[in-house]
Amino acid sequence: MAFGPAAMGYDRAITIFSPDGSLYQVDYAFEAVKKGWTAIGIKSKSSVVIASEKRKAQSLLDVDSIEKVFLIDDHVGCSFAGLASDGRVLIDYARNIALQHRLIYDEPVSIDYLTKSVADVKQMYTQHGGVRPFGVALVIAGIDKSVPKLFMTEPSGQYMPYQAVAIGQGYYTATEFLEKNYKEDLNVEETILLALKALSATLKPNEKLTPNTVEIGYASTQTGLFLKMTNEDKNMYLQKL
Protein backbone atom coordinates (compact mmCIF):
# COMPACT_ATOMS: atom_id res chain seq x y z
CA MET A 1 0.00 0.00 0.00
CA ALA A 2 1.65 3.26 -1.15
CA PHE A 3 0.56 6.86 -0.86
CA GLY A 4 1.73 10.10 -2.42
CA PRO A 5 2.63 13.35 -0.62
CA ALA A 6 -1.01 14.45 -0.41
CA ALA A 7 -1.81 11.44 1.76
CA MET A 8 1.15 11.72 4.11
CA GLY A 9 -0.73 13.67 6.80
CA TYR A 10 -3.49 11.07 6.95
CA ASP A 11 -0.89 8.31 6.79
CA ARG A 12 0.93 9.45 9.93
CA ALA A 13 -1.94 10.60 12.14
CA ILE A 14 -4.06 7.84 13.61
CA THR A 15 -6.89 10.16 14.67
CA ILE A 16 -7.47 11.77 11.26
CA PHE A 17 -9.62 10.21 8.55
CA SER A 18 -8.44 10.44 4.97
CA PRO A 19 -10.84 11.99 2.41
CA ASP A 20 -11.93 8.50 1.36
CA GLY A 21 -12.86 7.58 4.95
CA SER A 22 -9.82 5.47 5.81
CA LEU A 23 -7.62 5.37 8.89
CA TYR A 24 -4.37 4.39 7.24
CA GLN A 25 -2.66 3.22 10.45
CA VAL A 26 -5.54 0.79 11.03
CA ASP A 27 -5.19 -0.41 7.44
CA TYR A 28 -1.49 -1.03 8.07
CA ALA A 29 -2.37 -3.04 11.19
CA PHE A 30 -4.49 -5.31 8.98
CA GLU A 31 -1.42 -5.82 6.77
CA ALA A 32 0.54 -6.98 9.84
CA VAL A 33 -2.16 -9.60 10.47
CA LYS A 34 -1.80 -10.90 6.91
CA LYS A 35 1.90 -11.55 7.54
CA GLY A 36 1.26 -13.73 10.61
CA TRP A 37 1.15 -17.51 10.77
CA THR A 38 -2.17 -18.97 9.73
CA ALA A 39 -4.71 -19.77 12.44
CA ILE A 40 -8.11 -21.39 11.94
CA GLY A 41 -11.19 -21.60 14.14
CA ILE A 42 -14.15 -23.90 13.50
CA LYS A 43 -17.42 -24.27 15.40
CA SER A 44 -19.84 -27.18 15.07
CA LYS A 45 -23.02 -27.96 16.99
CA SER A 46 -21.06 -29.82 19.65
CA SER A 47 -17.50 -28.49 19.60
CA VAL A 48 -15.02 -25.76 18.76
CA VAL A 49 -11.49 -26.20 17.43
CA ILE A 50 -8.57 -23.81 16.98
CA ALA A 51 -5.59 -24.92 14.88
CA SER A 52 -2.55 -22.78 14.17
CA GLU A 53 0.70 -23.38 12.39
CA LYS A 54 3.92 -22.51 14.19
CA ARG A 55 7.28 -21.96 12.59
CA LYS A 56 10.78 -21.14 13.73
CA ALA A 57 11.65 -17.50 13.12
CA GLN A 58 15.30 -18.52 13.59
CA SER A 59 16.91 -21.89 12.93
CA LEU A 60 18.33 -22.19 16.47
CA LEU A 61 15.09 -21.32 18.22
CA ASP A 62 13.65 -23.99 20.53
CA VAL A 63 10.39 -24.98 18.83
CA ASP A 64 8.91 -26.08 22.17
CA SER A 65 9.06 -22.46 23.33
CA ILE A 66 6.69 -21.34 20.57
CA GLU A 67 3.05 -21.17 21.62
CA LYS A 68 0.22 -20.34 19.23
CA VAL A 69 -2.87 -21.69 21.00
CA PHE A 70 -3.47 -20.21 24.44
CA LEU A 71 -5.75 -21.07 27.35
CA ILE A 72 -7.71 -18.05 28.61
CA ASP A 73 -9.82 -19.94 31.15
CA ASP A 74 -10.97 -23.52 31.65
CA HIS A 75 -13.68 -23.14 28.98
CA VAL A 76 -12.09 -20.79 26.43
CA GLY A 77 -8.91 -20.46 24.39
CA CYS A 78 -7.54 -18.36 21.57
CA SER A 79 -4.93 -17.94 18.87
CA PHE A 80 -3.69 -14.92 16.95
CA ALA A 81 -2.02 -13.75 13.76
CA GLY A 82 0.14 -10.65 13.54
CA LEU A 83 2.65 -9.10 15.91
CA ALA A 84 3.45 -11.65 18.62
CA SER A 85 4.10 -9.01 21.28
CA ASP A 86 0.71 -7.41 20.65
CA GLY A 87 -0.94 -10.81 20.83
CA ARG A 88 0.74 -11.59 24.16
CA VAL A 89 -0.46 -8.31 25.70
CA LEU A 90 -4.07 -8.89 24.63
CA ILE A 91 -4.03 -12.52 25.77
CA ASP A 92 -2.78 -11.44 29.21
CA TYR A 93 -5.56 -8.85 29.30
CA ALA A 94 -8.17 -11.48 28.41
CA ARG A 95 -6.85 -13.79 31.13
CA ASN A 96 -7.14 -10.99 33.69
CA ILE A 97 -10.74 -10.32 32.62
CA ALA A 98 -11.56 -14.03 33.03
CA LEU A 99 -9.84 -14.21 36.42
CA GLN A 100 -11.53 -11.08 37.77
CA HIS A 101 -14.92 -12.38 36.67
CA ARG A 102 -14.38 -15.65 38.55
CA LEU A 103 -13.24 -13.82 41.68
CA ILE A 104 -16.16 -11.38 41.68
CA TYR A 105 -19.03 -13.55 40.41
CA ASP A 106 -17.76 -17.08 41.14
CA GLU A 107 -18.59 -18.23 37.63
CA PRO A 108 -16.84 -18.46 34.24
CA VAL A 109 -16.84 -15.32 32.13
CA SER A 110 -19.13 -15.42 29.10
CA ILE A 111 -17.21 -15.66 25.84
CA ASP A 112 -19.30 -12.86 24.34
CA TYR A 113 -18.31 -10.50 27.17
CA LEU A 114 -14.67 -11.60 27.06
CA THR A 115 -14.46 -10.96 23.32
CA LYS A 116 -16.17 -7.58 23.61
CA SER A 117 -13.75 -6.54 26.37
CA VAL A 118 -10.73 -7.36 24.18
CA ALA A 119 -12.29 -5.69 21.14
CA ASP A 120 -13.05 -2.54 23.16
CA VAL A 121 -9.35 -2.20 24.04
CA LYS A 122 -8.38 -2.63 20.40
CA GLN A 123 -10.90 0.01 19.36
CA MET A 124 -9.59 2.51 21.93
CA TYR A 125 -6.17 2.26 20.32
CA THR A 126 -7.57 3.49 17.01
CA GLN A 127 -8.84 6.88 18.24
CA HIS A 128 -6.18 8.34 20.55
CA GLY A 129 -3.01 10.21 19.65
CA GLY A 130 0.34 8.90 20.83
CA VAL A 131 -0.60 5.23 20.40
CA ARG A 132 -0.88 2.82 17.50
CA PRO A 133 -3.43 0.10 16.69
CA PHE A 134 -2.77 -3.47 17.77
CA GLY A 135 -1.34 -5.29 14.75
CA VAL A 136 -3.03 -8.55 15.59
CA ALA A 137 -6.27 -10.45 15.01
CA LEU A 138 -7.51 -12.91 17.63
CA VAL A 139 -9.61 -16.06 17.21
CA ILE A 140 -11.45 -16.74 20.48
CA ALA A 141 -13.35 -20.00 20.97
CA GLY A 142 -14.89 -22.06 23.74
CA ILE A 143 -18.00 -23.50 25.33
CA ASP A 144 -20.40 -21.08 27.00
CA LYS A 145 -23.13 -22.79 29.06
CA SER A 146 -23.04 -25.85 26.79
CA VAL A 147 -23.09 -23.69 23.64
CA PRO A 148 -20.03 -23.55 21.32
CA LYS A 149 -18.86 -20.00 20.60
CA LEU A 150 -16.36 -18.70 18.03
CA PHE A 151 -15.33 -15.08 17.49
CA MET A 152 -12.67 -13.16 15.60
CA THR A 153 -11.49 -9.68 16.61
CA GLU A 154 -9.90 -7.32 14.08
CA PRO A 155 -7.27 -4.59 14.65
CA SER A 156 -10.04 -2.00 14.24
CA GLY A 157 -11.90 -3.34 17.29
CA GLN A 158 -14.59 -4.97 15.17
CA TYR A 159 -15.58 -8.47 16.28
CA MET A 160 -17.99 -10.98 14.80
CA PRO A 161 -19.22 -14.51 15.54
CA TYR A 162 -18.28 -17.17 13.00
CA GLN A 163 -19.02 -20.76 12.04
CA ALA A 164 -15.47 -20.99 10.70
CA VAL A 165 -12.75 -18.37 10.26
CA ALA A 166 -9.12 -18.12 9.15
CA ILE A 167 -6.53 -15.40 9.80
CA GLY A 168 -2.89 -14.89 8.83
CA GLN A 169 -0.89 -15.57 5.69
CA GLY A 170 -3.06 -18.40 4.42
CA TYR A 171 -6.45 -16.94 5.33
CA TYR A 172 -7.68 -16.68 1.73
CA THR A 173 -6.87 -20.29 0.78
CA ALA A 174 -8.11 -21.64 4.11
CA THR A 175 -11.36 -19.66 3.87
CA GLU A 176 -12.01 -21.01 0.38
CA PHE A 177 -11.44 -24.56 1.66
CA LEU A 178 -13.74 -24.07 4.64
CA GLU A 179 -16.51 -22.57 2.51
CA LYS A 180 -16.50 -25.73 0.38
CA ASN A 181 -16.14 -28.31 3.16
CA TYR A 182 -17.70 -26.92 6.35
CA LYS A 183 -20.67 -28.76 7.87
CA GLU A 184 -22.42 -27.76 11.08
CA ASP A 185 -23.10 -31.30 12.32
CA LEU A 186 -19.46 -32.43 12.61
CA ASN A 187 -18.36 -34.18 15.79
CA VAL A 188 -15.21 -33.05 17.58
CA GLU A 189 -12.94 -35.52 15.76
CA GLU A 190 -14.29 -34.48 12.36
CA THR A 191 -13.94 -30.81 13.28
CA ILE A 192 -10.29 -31.31 14.23
CA LEU A 193 -9.61 -33.10 10.94
CA LEU A 194 -11.33 -30.34 8.97
CA ALA A 195 -9.17 -27.71 10.69
CA LEU A 196 -6.00 -29.67 9.90
CA LYS A 197 -7.04 -30.15 6.27
CA ALA A 198 -7.76 -26.43 5.92
CA LEU A 199 -4.37 -25.62 7.43
CA SER A 200 -2.66 -28.14 5.14
CA ALA A 201 -4.27 -26.49 2.12
CA THR A 202 -2.31 -23.30 2.87
CA LEU A 203 1.11 -25.00 2.76
CA LYS A 204 3.52 -25.13 -0.16
CA PRO A 205 3.55 -28.37 -2.22
CA ASN A 206 6.73 -29.64 -0.53
CA GLU A 207 5.52 -28.87 3.00
CA LYS A 208 3.42 -30.89 5.40
CA LEU A 209 2.15 -30.51 8.93
CA THR A 210 3.94 -32.28 11.77
CA PRO A 211 3.25 -32.35 15.52
CA ASN A 212 5.97 -29.71 15.92
CA THR A 213 4.55 -27.31 13.31
CA VAL A 214 0.92 -27.17 14.42
CA GLU A 215 -0.91 -26.45 17.65
CA ILE A 216 -4.49 -27.54 18.29
CA GLY A 217 -6.95 -26.58 20.99
CA TYR A 218 -10.49 -27.91 21.25
CA ALA A 219 -13.56 -28.03 23.46
CA SER A 220 -16.74 -30.09 23.35
CA THR A 221 -20.15 -29.56 24.88
CA GLN A 222 -19.72 -32.91 26.63
CA THR A 223 -16.96 -31.64 28.95
CA GLY A 224 -17.10 -27.87 28.48
CA LEU A 225 -13.31 -27.71 28.87
CA PHE A 226 -10.87 -26.16 26.40
CA LEU A 227 -7.90 -28.49 26.03
CA LYS A 228 -4.61 -28.35 24.16
CA MET A 229 -3.68 -31.44 22.21
CA THR A 230 -0.51 -33.40 22.97
CA ASN A 231 2.04 -34.29 20.27
CA GLU A 232 0.93 -37.93 20.45
CA ASP A 233 -2.69 -37.00 19.75
CA LYS A 234 -1.67 -34.55 17.02
CA ASN A 235 0.33 -37.28 15.31
CA MET A 236 -2.68 -39.60 15.42
CA TYR A 237 -4.87 -37.05 13.62
CA LEU A 238 -2.15 -36.05 11.14
CA GLN A 239 -1.84 -39.68 10.04
CA LYS A 240 -5.51 -39.57 9.02
CA LEU A 241 -5.03 -36.70 6.55
UniProtKB/Swiss-Prot annotation:
HAMAP family: Proteasome_A_A (MF_00289_A). This is Proteasome subunit alpha. The formation of the proteasomal ATPase PAN-20S proteasome complex, via the docking of the C-termini of PAN into the intersubunit pockets in the alpha-rings, triggers opening of the gate for substrate entry. Interconversion between the open-gate and close-gate conformations leads to a dynamic regulation of the 20S proteasome proteolysis activity. One of its GO terms (cellular component) is proteasome core complex, alpha-subunit complex. InterPro entries: Ntn_hydrolases_N (IPR029055), Proteasome_alpha (IPR050115), Proteasome_alpha-type (IPR023332), Proteasome_asu_arc (IPR019982), Proteasome_asu_N (IPR000426), Proteasome_sua/b (IPR001353). The keyword Endoplasmic reticulum does not apply. Signal peptide: none annotated. GO terms for molecular function: threonine-type endopeptidase activity. It comes from the Archaea. The 20S proteasome core is composed of 14 alpha and 14 beta subunits that assemble into four stacked heptameric rings, resulting in a barrel-shaped structure. The two inner rings, each composed of seven catalytic beta subunits, are sandwiched by two outer rings, each composed of seven alpha subunits. The catalytic chamber with the active sites is on the inside of the barrel. Has a gated structure, the ends of the cylinder being occluded by the N-termini of the alpha-subunits. Is capped at one or both ends by the proteasome regulatory ATPase, PAN. It holds the Pfam family Proteasome. Keywords: Cytoplasm, Proteasome. It comes from Saccharolobus solfataricus (strain ATCC 35092 / DSM 1617 / JCM 11322 / P2) (Sulfolobus solfataricus). Its main location: cytoplasm. PANTHER family: PROTEASOME SUBUNIT ALPHA/BETA.
